[in-house]
Amino acid sequence: MLFVLDAGNTNIVLGIYKGKELVLECRLGTDAKRTADEYGIQVLKLLSHNNIDPKDIEGVIISSVVPNIMYSIEHMIRKYFKIDPIVVGPGVKTGINIKYDNPKSVGADRIVNAVAAHALFEKPLVIIDFGTATTYCAVTKKGDYLGGAICPGIKISAAALFEKAAKLPRIELIKPPHVICKNTVSSMQAGIVYGYIGQVDYIVSKIKEEMIALGEGEPYVIATGGFAGLISEESKTIDEVCPFLTLEGLRVIYEKNKE
């Protein structure tokens, strides 16, 4: 079995693969104060609860956008699984040609998503990842990573509204049936959710224009991350939601580097 970990700003997403099949996906809260032992105990509990024997895990791969937790995560893997993990970064084979001004500055999660999407679709792509930040990435048919855009995530956008406007309450992020709303909560939901959908569709339309101008043709638009389902319901530009895109990318990269 293969153990894949994607450490984000809010959550660490864990996956267990048996061959090419994802047999377990679960999450831990990201906490820089947590020790390797604390992470180890939590991970072993999750595996035990799902009837997975740690001795069956033969490889581990990690991607992270949170540098200050990496010592604990890597030490946890070595101590509790007796495995040296592959860590996505410089020197790791991805099959993606990064056309960024400084390739080392691209977030590991963005590269991992690009690897998965290119392996799955082999066509011009726009990849949207709805995480703590929302990222937009453009990938060519042959696998060149062109770059993209980074925006505040929908939760960050909502939190800014709650914190800066004293009389506005915290709300659940759901899509109301109308934009013309009759109460404060629904009005806020409409503004945040429909406003974010508008942002997505406009940014994607601009990326499409630029990719077409480069001769790539019309890109296929895929979305992943916690709010992909909510936004895709109303978006005019998202073609497909891939909820486990990052985990799949880690599996593909592991296969390229395990020899």
UniProtKB/Swiss-Prot annotation:
Its cofactor is NH4(+); K(+). It catalyses: (R)-pantothenate + ATP = (R)-4'-phosphopantothenate + ADP + H(+). Its main location: cytoplasm. A monovalent cation. Ammonium or potassium. The keyword Glycosyltransferase does not apply. It is found in: Cytoplasm. It holds the Pfam family Pan_kinase. Substrate binds at residues 100, 107-110, 184. K(+) binds at residue 129. The keyword Metal-binding applies. One of its GO terms (molecular function) is metal ion binding. Pathway: Cofactor biosynthesis; coenzyme A biosynthesis; CoA from (R)-pantothenate: step 1/5. ATP binds at residues 6-13, 132. InterPro entries: ATPase_NBD, Type_III_PanK. Keywords: ATP-binding, Coenzyme A biosynthesis, Cytoplasm, Kinase, Metal-binding, Nucleotide-binding, Potassium, Transferase. GO terms for biological process: coenzyme A biosynthetic process. Homodimer. Catalyzes the phosphorylation of pantothenate (Pan), the first step in CoA biosynthesis. Belongs to the type III pantothenate kinase family. This is Type III pantothenate kinase. The gene is coaX.
